[in-house]
Amino acid sequence: MFKNAFANLQKVGKSLMLPVSVLPIAGILLGVGSANFSWLPAVVSHVMAEAGGSVFANMPLIFAIGVALGFTNNDGVSALAAVVAYGIMVKTMAVVAPLVLHLPAEEIAAKHLADTGVLGGIISGAIAAYMFNRFYRIKLPEYLGFFAGKRFVPIISGLAAIFTGVVLSFVWPPIGTAIQAFSQWAAYQNPVVAFGIYGFIERCLVPFGLHHIWNVPFQMQIGEYTNAAGQVFHGDIPRYMAGDPTAGMLSGGFLFKMYGLPAAAIAIWHSAKPENRAKVGGIMISAALTSFLTGITEPIEFSFMFVAPILYIIHAILAGLAFPICILLGMRDGTSFSHGLIDFIVLSGNSSKLWLFPIVGAGYAIVYYTVFRVLIKALDLKTPGREDTTDDAKAGATSEMAPALVAAFGGKENITNLDACITRLRVSVADVAKVDQAGLKKLGAAGVVVAGSGVQAIFGTKSDNLKTEMDEYIRNS
């Protein structure tokens, strides 16, 4: 049971990355357009704001498509089914909810009693994915043959969405009310506590690749803002981009991604044995620059996550504290993908106290460096370059690595599902015992996570290319 649950959660996490991948361009368009820069013509700002806003306004539908594709090996029919399911589900609720609640449609809309948001998109995507996997090979009588196979999937998904819409009309109002109450508490009443908890748990979920699921309600659901054009935005990211002065609570990520973790990487480099210092320095400096520029932290985190768990626990606590610090000091900046220098500069149009970030960030860097340096030495932690024995990595070009990677996962017969997100290969296997974890690390994996039948190997931003090469190798071998 646990094996299947973790494997499915892995797929959910991966499927959510597709909708998230559109945030950078949408965020830049909306953020820059809403900032009304004096050097940008008004018509250009308006076009950019409307273009970016259209993406955020359709995020539930985009999430529906992403979830459907994530569970069906990117089959386009499931995406069509998700669109059909979402549209039908929403319209069904619009008709049934007033009858169930005995309230006018206007009041239901004002109280968001039938507004499922991105969660409704995820539900619709799950319906489409289930129906696709269940019916894509269905055979019908000859006179209905045109509707057999994959053509049947959007039809049955739409019918299932009607039933789902009716059920949600009964069960969603109390759920929606609870979500709305949490949203108000987190966004307006006690954001210091809410985002402190968010930051700590988010880092705790990184080892399992499940942090994308935890991010969704905070990034895309909490809070509400209506701009001058009447567009309504939910979630901290869309609200900030649209110009909401109360948004930007996710700014704490800049402190530990741009300053804290790069300092930790330098501490690991300085703590390596003299004979390994040059090699470790190259790896750590590269990882530090990646974190500073793009906010991608896994190459650093997985270098100490398993060999020195105490360091990761402290890191998670410091990451959690970064968010309340920024909120209490009134520091606000925008993020679309992750908290790196690119986001920091490009999305600064609606920011507050931007000058404080490098000052507080320098303090965070000192704390990280000191804690890591002292504990590594005092506890003799086996961080990179301090191991008793070292193996040279055999990593090469992605096309050259594919056969070795397939072999390390136990061979193509052992691989039941192959996927990748931004920084890790996500592989489901028939027999975990056949997976060569040491071999994966020799090939360049920063870490390997095994839970149930799911295996994650962290190869950084080249993971998706590795997945493509492995797919091609498996098909042609």
Curated annotation (Swiss-Prot):
GO terms for molecular function: D-glucose transmembrane transporter activity; kinase activity; protein-N(PI)-phosphohistidine-sugar phosphotransferase activity; protein-phosphocysteine-glucose phosphotransferase system transporter activity. The active site is at C421. Its EC number is 2.7.1.199. It catalyses: N(pros)-phospho-L-histidyl-[protein] + D-glucose(out) = D-glucose 6-phosphate(in) + L-histidyl-[protein]. Keywords: Cell inner membrane, Cell membrane, Kinase, Membrane, Phosphoprotein, Phosphotransferase system, Sugar transport, Transferase, Transmembrane, Transmembrane helix, Transport. Signal peptide: none annotated. It is found in: Cell inner membrane. The chain crosses the membrane at residues 15-35, 51-71, 80-100, 112-132, 152-172, 191-211, 249-269, 280-300, 310-330, 356-376. Residues 1-14, 72-79, 133-151, 212-248, 301-309, 377-477 are cytoplasmic. GO terms for biological process: D-glucose transmembrane transport; phosphoenolpyruvate-dependent sugar phosphotransferase system. It holds the Pfam family PTS_EIIC. PROSITE patterns: PTS_EIIB_TYPE_1, PTS_EIIB_TYPE_1_CYS, PTS_EIIC_TYPE_1. The EIIB domain is phosphorylated by phospho-EIIA on a cysteinyl or histidyl residue, depending on the transported sugar. Then, it transfers the phosphoryl group to the sugar substrate concomitantly with the sugar uptake processed by the EIIC domain. The EIIC domain forms the PTS system translocation channel and contains the specific substrate-binding site. This is PTS system glucose-specific EIICB component.
